[in-house]
């Protein structure tokens, strides 16, 4: 039996889908991607997506001692993927964020974790794609990494951008509520 819960969220306007599909920064793959991660000039790294998070762990596990956030939903290209093994020393968090939306729970969790400067894995029930916008919005001194399926990893060194020159795409989202179905015990 499942219980329907109403959760506050921000919905992606249809006319913004194409604009947000474009990379927010340079796209890298292979060794160039790994070098960008290893040479980050920022104080923390946030990796959004299952495949990208696995690549971040493989690249940064022994070489990076700074803050690290991994955000996963158990899917790649909307298909089930392997389970994320939580690395030792990481705190686990769970949020809900329906597809095509950014829940306020997910937004505030990411922003709060970026202020804490720890090591975290965030499991998303729903879809993690738009959580990259929360990381870009809140992670002023962070490197934000997310995947473009079939292309590579987008690496945005937010610490190198001048503050105040960019408007958050999140401001254009439509506030509302969404129904989330949760299994009852």
From Swiss-Prot:
The keyword GTP-binding applies. Its EC number is 2.7.1.237. Keywords: Coenzyme A biosynthesis, GTP-binding, Kinase, Nucleotide-binding, Transferase. The keyword Mitochondrion does not apply. It comes from the Archaea. GO terms for biological process: coenzyme A biosynthetic process. GO terms for molecular function: GTP binding; kinase activity. Pathway: Cofactor biosynthesis; coenzyme A biosynthesis. GTP binds at residues 50, 52, 73, 75, 128. It catalyses: 3'-dephospho-CoA + GTP = GDP + CoA + H(+). InterPro entries: GTP-dep_dephospho-CoA_kin (IPR007164). Catalyzes the GTP-dependent phosphorylation of the 3'-hydroxyl group of dephosphocoenzyme A to form coenzyme A (CoA). Belongs to the GTP-dependent DPCK family. PANTHER family: GTP-DEPENDENT DEPHOSPHO-COA KINASE, UPF0218 PROTEIN TK1697. This is GTP-dependent dephospho-CoA kinase. It comes from Aeropyrum pernix (strain ATCC 700893 / DSM 11879 / JCM 9820 / NBRC 100138 / K1).
């Amino acid at each position: 039996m499942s219980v329907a819960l109403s959760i506050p969220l921000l919905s992606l306007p249809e006319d913004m889908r194409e604009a947000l599909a474009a990379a927010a920064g340079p796209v890298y793959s292979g060794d160039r991607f790994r070098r960008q991660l290893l040479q980050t000039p920022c104080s923390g790294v946030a990796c959004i997506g299952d495949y990208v998070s696995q690549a971040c762990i493989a690249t940064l596990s022994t070489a990076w001692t700074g803050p690290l956030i991994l955000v996963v939903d158990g899917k790649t290209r909307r298909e089930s993927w392997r389970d994320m093994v939580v690395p030792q020393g990481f705190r686990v968090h769970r949020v809900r964020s329906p597809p095509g939306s950014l829940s306020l729970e997910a937004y505030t969790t990411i922003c709060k974790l970026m202020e804490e400067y720890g090591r975290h894995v965030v499991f998303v029930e729903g879809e993690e794609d738009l959580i990259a916008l929360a990381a870009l919005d809140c992670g002023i001194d962070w490197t934000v990494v997310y995947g473009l399926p079939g292309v590579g990893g987008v690496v945005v060194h937010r610490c190198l951008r001048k503050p105040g020159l960019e408007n958050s795409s999140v401001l254009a989202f439509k506030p509302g509520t969404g129904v989330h179905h949760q299994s009852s015990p």
